[in-house]
UniProtKB/Swiss-Prot annotation:
Subcellular location: Cell membrane
Protein name according to UniProt: Putative membrane protein insertion efficiency factor 2
Function of the protein: Could be involved in insertion of integral membrane proteins into the membrane.
Topology class, membrane: Peripheral membrane protein
Database matches in PANTHER family: MEMBRANE PROTEIN INSERTION EFFICIENCY FACTOR-RELATED
UniProt xrefs under HAMAP family: UPF0161_YidD
Family designation: Belongs to the UPF0161 family.
Sequence intervals crossing the membrane: none
GO CC annotation terms, alphabetical: plasma membrane
Alphabetic keyword roster: Cell membrane, Membrane
Organism ancestry: Bacteria, Bacillati, Bacillota, Bacilli, Bacillales
Highest rank taxon of the organism: Bacteria
Major subcellular site: membrane
Amino acid sequence: MKTVFLLLIRFYQKWISPALPPTCRFYPTCSNYGLEAIEKHGAFKGGWLTIKRILKCHPFHPGGIDPVPEKKQKD
């Protein structure tokens, strides 16, 4: 599942994103955030973090630096 999500994001970055004007208001970009979130947290939590990030990326949000949260350590 994780691999499928990562391949979808990489496909978007290689083939779809170059045809569109740059619009992401954040650093890292939403697609790079998605790659990092899924790598770090897995398909489900990373996917959820990515969806939340994409929903924040609109003209009424100021944007800025928004790193992927660190993975919590279990005691």
